[in-house]
């Protein structure tokens, strides 16, 4: 698929306070269009990954609001208009009202989401 928009993305994921439109692109990358409806620290969802942190590298752009990522020794905050790269080893923190676009390697995204979904099934939120 050579291009995608929020409206044309083939997958939709909704969880408490989060809506994601997702498309797997050619070249081994996926794009996520995210709307954060509520504040949320997602720490419990990454239990079982290395250091119980997200191991997904992310390249993103903040369309509206802000998003942040907690590392073992610091926190990074990105606000409207910021482009960013976040390496593996973080915890995403959602801020209500934020809208972001992120790109990640499809294979790593799939493996990470497998762990996240198992944790959700076990009652993590």
What are the residue ranges of the model-derived segments?
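Conserved hydrophobic/aromatic beta-strand scaffold that supports enzyme active sites
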Residues: 4, 20-22, 33, 59, ...
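Vicinal oxygen chelate
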Residues: 10, 45-53, 119
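A short glycine-rich, His/Asp/Glu-containing loop-to-beta-strand
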Residues: 14-50
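Short strand-coil-strand connectors
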Residues: 26-27, 70-74, 95-97
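Short, conserved beta-strand element in jelly-roll/cupin
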Residues: 51-69
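Short acidic-glycine-tyrosine-enriched beta hairpin
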Residues: 71-90
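Ligand-binding loop in jelly-roll beta-barrel domains
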Residues: 88-113
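Glycine- and charge-enriched low-complexity intrinsically disordered segments
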Residues: 114-125
